[in-house]
From Swiss-Prot:
Single GO MF descriptor: structural constituent of ribosome
InterPro entries tied to this protein: Ribosomal_bL33, Ribosomal_bL33_CS, Ribosomal_bL33_sf, Ribosomal_zn-bd
Protein name: Large ribosomal subunit protein bL33A
Pfam families listed in its UniProt record: Ribosomal_L33 (PF00471)
KW Cell cycle (keyword) present: no
BP GO terms, sorted: translation
PANTHER family: 54S RIBOSOMAL PROTEIN L39, MITOCHONDRIAL (PTHR15238), LARGE RIBOSOMAL SUBUNIT PROTEIN BL33M (PTHR15238:SF1)
Species this chain originates from: Salinispora arenicola (strain CNS-205)
Domain of life, per lineage: Bacteria
GO cellular component: cytosolic large ribosomal subunit
Length: 55
């Protein structure tokens, strides 16, 4: 069972293009205490957009 205080929790990255496409990744809470923002490819929008951490 995963603990709530896990150092590397699984986070869901949701597209800011409004397509509803998501990536699932893990992040290190010690290095990235804020919400994660990555620029990745959205296949529905067919371009690179910002993906923000959704909670």
């Amino acid at each position: 069972m995963a603990r709530q205080t896990d150092v590397r929790p699984i986070v869901r990255l949701r597209s800011t293009a409004g397509t509803g496409y998501t990536y699932v990744t893990r992040k290190n809470r010690r290095n990235d205490p804020d919400r994660l923002v990555l620029r990745k490819y959205d296949p529905i929008a067919r371009r690179h957009v910002e993906f923000r951490e959704a909670r």
